[in-house]
Regions:
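Short pre-active-site segment immediately N-terminal to the catalytic Zn-binding motif
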Residues: 2-21
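Active-site recognition of the HExxH zinc-binding catalytic motif
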Residues: 19-34
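Conserved catalytic/binding loops enriched for acidic/polar residues
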Residues: 8, 37-407
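Active-site and adjacent substrate-binding regions of carbohydrate-active enzymes
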Residues: 13, 31-32, 40-41
Length: 407
């Protein structure tokens, strides 16, 4: 933020070094990653100094963190969890405290320590459970670089911060720099962080909370709890606003004329033409989000989680995604970025219908329904101009080809 003084920057750097050292010492002591640690506090508590002082920002230093940067200096406290958290202290006590010589007594002692595993202070999520681009995990509370028990809202706010910082860089440049290389590098770093936070939001869709905690008093309590329909729907709404809608990337407009990297050899083919490749970069980011939302693992999970509480059906999920990609300019002028996005989405739906695809018959049926619905909308729409009309005809042609192929 603009309020970061030299003193605050030094504080941030010191805390990051403290985090790095504590994290690696934790590994030396046998601690694995705990990617549920950062979900310890509520979003509002991240700016409360008394809570930070007593509990920390995370229950574990073994997570991967993003810095907590407030919009104002008055609300800025710690930036990162830089010392062992409550989970770490508990796990280390279990492994290193002095035990009893009697094996039966020692077993009971360790069982007593482990019995507090279900309290929030001791929440744990390992690498293989983490929800990320690979879709290896499906609990949205177990993610890398997320923050708070409301990660979608933290990430939404972080994306808004990135927009402001990016626009400020475009207006003022990098102080003391005559070359645009540093501006180029910083804008790219911000752009990558924007995507990371969008993926954290996307993890809510089809998300299922789970726990392996052993509960003696209630062995039949649910181990899988789907994310509420409201939260999943809101996640798509946030993605619509920040990634899919027309103008979602307008915050970058002023930076495009300055995005010229220094020439450093000839090995990187990406820089051969020197231009900032606006449409390619933005489509690439949108593709990553669609990779997450339309992955066969995720879509099948949405279907299966309906058997244990998920009320956000596959048809509703795909309909909301279709609305996010088509509704805003159905009868309005359409820009190149939205053209690319709409074509990309239709191609993905087409691939879902292929006979040898990874998608189940249930998912293929839902994709088929979406294609019919989109084609109906496009045919009814009054194109804003000839360019929009040609684009819509191209989409209709692609849908018709895919449908006729299935027949």
């Amino acid at each position: 933020g603009d309020h970061l003084s030299e003193q605050e920057l030094m504080k941030m750097k010191t805390q990051y070094i403290g985090y790095l050292v504590s994290h690696e010492v934790g590994h030396t002591l046998g601690l694995t990653h705990n990617f549920k640690g950062s979900s310890f506090l509520k979003l509002a508590d991240l700016e409360k100094a008394d809570i930070e002082a007593s509990k920390g920002l995370s229950n574990s230093v073994m997570d991967y963190f993003t810095a907590v940067v407030s919009d104002t200096a008055a609300h800025q406290h710690d930036y990162i969890q830089y010392k062992p958290g409550l989970y770490d202290e508990w796990a280390i006590y279990y492994g290193y405290s002095t035990g009893f010589k009697d094996s039966t007594a020692e077993e009971k002692r360790l069982a007593f320590i482990a019995s507090s595993s279900e309290i929030p202070e001791h929440a744990f999520g390992m690498d293989s459970d983490a929800s990320d681009e690979s879709n290896a995990g499906f609990d949205p509370m177990v993610q890398r670089f997320d923050m708070s028990s409301e990660p979608q809202y933290f990430s939404y706010h972080r994306m808004q911060q990135i927009r402001r910082v990016s626009e400020n860089l475009s207006r003022n440049g990098v102080q003391g720099e005559s070359s645009t290389q540093k501006l180029f590098s910083q804008q790219n770093a911000l752009f990558a962080n924007y995507l990371r936070n969008a993926l954290i939001i996307a993890a809510q869709v089809g998300g299922v909370y789970f726990t392996r905690t052993q509960r003696k008093e209630d062995s039949l309590s649910p181990r899988f709890i789907p994310v509420t329909m409201e939260k999943q729907h809101e996640a798509i709404s946030l993605l619509r606003e920040m990634v899919f809608r027309p103008g979602a990337y307008d915050y970058l407009k002023k930076s495009y004329p300055m995005m010229l990297p220094e020439r450093r050899g000839y090995e990187n083919k990406y820089y051969e033409t020197n231009d900032p490749k606006v449409t390619e970069k933005i489509l690439g980011q949108q593709q990553k989000i669609l990779d997450k939302l339309m992955n066969p693992v995720i879509l099948n999970k949405i279907v299966n989680s309906g058997y244990y509480g998920n009320s956000y059906s596959l048809g509703e999920v795909l309909s909301d995604i279709s609305d996010a990609i088509f509704l805003d300019d159905l009868e309005a002028p359409i820009n190149h970025i939205r053209k690319n996005l709409q074509c990309e989405y239709i191609v993905r739906l087409e691939k879902m219908l292929e006979k040898n695809s990874e998608y189940s018959s249930v998912v293929q049926s839902a994709a088929y329904q979406q294609m019919l619905g989109i084609m109906k909308r496009l045919r009814k729409a009054r194109s804003a101009n000839s360019e929009a009309e040609i684009h819509q005809q191209l989409l209709i042609s692609g849908i018709q080809s895919a449908i006729s192929f299935r027949k």
